[in-house]
């Protein structure tokens, strides 16, 4: 018997896991295709405050807070050509979204928090 799906998501990283969770939460039958074996090393560990409301909607914000990732309150930009940098830019000064900080995450641990979430909803189908 061939199983059918409402959606096939290519990639199980943060974007793929987020889409899969949103779809599964809406009672869609989801298949996630990922060629890599988890946990895995991957770049992309610097989150921005805009991502925090998404994690709240997905129901993983508390798990992310509890994981103990480094809090990040802003950024500093460096120019290798001129050898100079900017003054620190605080998220609370630059963004007006009610989230003055974000996290610097270890991707293998971060992915491990996200991937099981869509499976939880999928298993409730």
Task: Name what the model sees in each region.
Residues 1-15, 31:
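Beta1/beta-strand and adjacent pyrophosphate-binding region of the FAD-binding site
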Residues 4, 77-125:
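Conserved N-terminal helical subregion
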Residues 8, 24-43:
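Glycine-rich FAD pyrophosphate-binding loop
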Residues 11-13, 35, 107:
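Glycine-rich Rossmann-fold phosphate-binding loop(s) that bind the pyrophosphate
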Residues 15, 19, 38:
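Conserved Rossmann-like nucleotide-cofactor binding loop
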Residues 21, 25, 53, 116, ...:
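Short, well-ordered alpha-helices that flank and scaffold nucleotide-derived cofactor binding pockets
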Residues 40-82:
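N-terminal FAD cofactor-binding segment of flavoenzymes
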